[in-house]
């Protein structure tokens, strides 16, 4: 009699559930980011956010590869992903913006409040993506926005303006880019994302003592990613095959 029958081990279920664990690990990375931000170690916080962004980028393709929805139909990967995204894309960046004193009181409370409330409402929008996989409205990527404000050492006026405009755009039917899933200009979009990430990593290595040329290039690449969705929306033939 065999003590262990390997044929009875639910390998498919174990493999699928491990993807959920990978996604959920983003919550611990966010916790480490909260600890760092509370101690004003913002460079460390953004490294943790960057790692969380990496996890967020790879868990979806892996989930589709191992057919997580089919194997584990009672576990919602989408719900789990939204929970982690809200913490890492919204809550932690809003906390960092407040902790940094970049805007100053009492407007820092107002800015953080606008970020977290508008983003919570956005996540409830069932029509946040278009047929071309653009996001409809600013897709609450506050981790990228707040990081950019840190890199450029934004003034209180600039930071508050960027926050206010982005919150306003959250509820407008203006397209924003999903750099991986949108097919139009995809090679260029991915190149700009790579440049943005490389320059962002360089800024962290420099502890935000970043040369002017790098700041300009970083902000320019960020503006491209921020605006290209709307440009492609108003010029539907641009980049179309």
Swiss-Prot record:
Which InterPro entries is this protein grouped with?
A: CDP-OH_PTrfase_TM_dom, PcS
Reaction catalysed by this enzyme:
a CDP-1,2-diacyl-sn-glycerol + choline = a 1,2-diacyl-sn-glycero-3-phosphocholine + CMP + H(+)
Q: What EC class is this?
A: transferase
The record places the following residue ranges in the Periplasmic compartment, namely 37-41, 98-100, 155-159, 209-214
Q: What is its EC number?
A: 2.7.8.24
The GO molecular function terms of this record are: identical protein binding; phosphatidylcholine synthase activity
Q: Which UniProt keywords apply?
A: Cell inner membrane, Cell membrane, Lipid biosynthesis, Lipid metabolism, Manganese, Membrane, Phospholipid biosynthesis, Phospholipid metabolism, Transferase, Transmembrane, Transmembrane helix
Residue ranges in the Cytoplasmic topological domain are: 1-15, 63-76, 122-133, 181-187, 236-241
The UniProt transmembrane annotation reads 16-36, 42-62, 77-97, 101-121, 134-154, 160-180, 188-208, 215-235
Q: How does it sit in the membrane?
A: Multi-pass membrane protein
- Its domain of life reads Bacteria
An annotated GO cellular component of this protein is:
plasma membrane
Cofactor requirements of the protein: Mn(2+)
The Gene Ontology biological process annotation of the record reads: phospholipid biosynthetic process
Indicate where this protein resides in the cell: Cell inner membrane
Q: Does the keyword Membrane apply?
A: yes
Question: Which family, according to UniProt?
Answer: Belongs to the CDP-alcohol phosphatidyltransferase class-I family.
Q: What does this protein do?
A: Condenses choline with CDP-diglyceride to produce phosphatidylcholine and CMP. Affects motility, biofilm formation and virulence of this bacterium when there is a complete loss of phosphatidylcholine formation due to absence of both the synthase (pcs) and the methylation (pmtA) pathways.
The protein's name in its UniProt record: Phosphatidylcholine synthase
Give the source species.
Answer: Agrobacterium fabrum (strain C58 / ATCC 33970) (Agrobacterium tumefaciens (strain C58))
Lineage of the species this protein comes from: Bacteria, Pseudomonadati, Pseudomonadota, Alphaproteobacteria, Hyphomicrobiales
């Amino acid at each position: 009699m065999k003590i262990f029958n390997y044929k009875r081990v639910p390998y498919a279920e174990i493999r699928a559930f491990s993807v959920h664990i990978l996604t959920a690990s983003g919550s611990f990375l966010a916790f480490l980011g909260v600890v760092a931000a509370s101690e004003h170690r913002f460079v460390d916080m953004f490294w943790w956010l960057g790692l969380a962004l990496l996890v967020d980028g790879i868990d979806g393709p892996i989930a589709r590869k191992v057919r997580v929805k089919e194997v584990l139909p009672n576990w919602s990967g989408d719900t789990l992903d939204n929970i982690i995204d809200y913490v890492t894309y919204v809550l932690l960046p809003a906390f960092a913006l407040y902790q940094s004193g970049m805007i100053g009181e009492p407007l820092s409370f107002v800015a953080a409040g606008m970020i977290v409330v508008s983003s919570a409402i956005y996540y409830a929008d069932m029509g946040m993506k278009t047929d071309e996989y653009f996001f409809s409205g600013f897709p609450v990527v506050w981790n990228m926005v707040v990081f950019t404000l840190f890199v450029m050492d934004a003034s209180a006026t600039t930071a508050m303006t960027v926050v206010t405009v982005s919150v306003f755009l959250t509820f407008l039917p203006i397209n924003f880019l999903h750099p991986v899933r949108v097919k139009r200009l995809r090679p260029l979009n991915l190149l700009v994302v790579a440049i943005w990430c490389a320059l962002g990593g360089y800024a962290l290595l420099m502890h935000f003592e970043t040369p002017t040329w790098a700041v300009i290039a970083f902000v320019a690449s960020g503006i491209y990613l921020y605006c290209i969705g709307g440009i492609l929306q108003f010029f539907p033939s641009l980049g179309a095959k």
